[in-house]
A protein has these predicted regions:
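Cofactor-binding beta-sheet edge motifs in enzyme active sites
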Residues: 2-23, 32-226
Length: 226
């Protein structure tokens, strides 16, 4: 569920931030609205997706990797709806703060339910970000947003053929309002590139695969208490 998004502003890009930031709070898609907080890493809610001015995209995973591939599957859900180029995405791990989950929930990873539990809000988050980038493209070229498409980290005006990388649009997108939940348009299943697509999980796309298969990965079981 999106909470009060129509009254929130997208985090404004600045030299300190270099892009815009999406967040998750209380199990809902939200946005950070303080540049000062962004610069210091102190947020009311967890950092979720960052798109930088160079187009590089950082997705935060709030579930724990235990060899099941959750650090690939969950960020790929966001990337799919965002129409992001996976090769330009990186994944960082969330901390253990309760801000990542609804009140009364545990920030745990168990029962093979991470995707089932999070897929709806992750899809919504990615789709909302994509729509804002499309709106930014429409504003940049002064054309109707209905003439704008997005694919593979690029926004295109179909009639003129003009295009812009996501990184070129973060400044404009930072001044736009977040779409209401009822207006967020997620992809049809037939349009999925990563979700439910086994071919997307090739070794080169799998986060941490080399570390997991060579024994370099660090897990909770590796912790030795003094």
């Amino acid at each position: 569920m999106l909470v009060n998004l129509t009254r929130r502003n997208l985090l404004k890009g600045s030299a300190a931030v270099g892009g815009f930031v999406f967040g998750v709070q209380s199990g809902s898609v939200g946005l950070m609205n303080s540049v000062a907080e962004a610069a210091t890493g102190s947020f009311d809610a967890g950092l979720y997706v960052t798109i930088n001015n160079d187009g590089s995209t950082v997705i935060t995973c709030a579930r724990s990797e235990m060899g099941q591939g959750v650090r690939t599957s969950l960020p790929m859900i966001v990337a799919d709806e965002l129409e992001a180029d996976w090769s330009r995405c990186s994944v960082v791990q969330a901390d253990g703060d309760q801000k990542w989950v609804d009140a009364g929930q545990e920030l745990d990873t168990d029962g093979s339910r991470s995707v089932r539990r999070d897929i709806k809000r992750l899809r919504t988050a990615g789709a909302a970000a994509r729509m804002m980038l499309e709106q930014a493209g429409a504003k940049k070229w002064n054309v109707p947003v209905s003439e704008i498409t997005s694919q593979n980290h690029t926004v295109t005006h179909t009639k003129s053929g003009r295009s812009a990388d996501y990184g070129e649009l973060v400044g404009i997108a930072s001044g736009l309002s977040v779409p209401a939940e009822s207006d967020v348009q997620v992809k049809d299943r037939s349009e999925w590139k990563y979700i439910n697509n086994e071919s997307a999980f090739t070794p080169d796309k799998y986060v941490d695969l080399m570390d997991m298969t060579t024994g370099k990965g660090i897990y909770g079981a590796d912790v030795i208490l003094p």
